[in-house]
């Protein structure tokens, strides 16, 4: 009688994810919602003239990188604040390039804006996003206004061990 050990490794995650949304977004910088309406609509899936599209842009970039967007955690993925439930929370002192940052917008408590952190310049954060002055561009934001910072962390591999006894190997 022999004992055979079987090990199954299950990798769960975003295969092929680059995790650098700033590089992924480069070809879209400068696109304007009216002038480039068709291109933006095809990429983000909404009409940028009729819909606030910052969250759609972030979701489209994440999807292009093989990363699940806010639709994986929210029934309202087109709302910037849906990203407050996405990924893992990050403290401002630990912010890194590519982290998703959510800011308030307007006076309504449900409104917001979302984009990707690029770097710090002085006392401001450089944020790359869609629907910033009606286009894809870099803008400076006050970090004290951030509602939340989130980061995608790929799931780790899980390992299952099982034992098969009384295996006849003849």
Q: What residue ranges belong to the model's regions?
A:
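...with weaker cross-activation on analogous glycine-rich loops/strands in unrelated enzymes
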Residues: 22-23, 68-137
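Sec-dependent N-terminal signal peptides
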Residues: 3-13
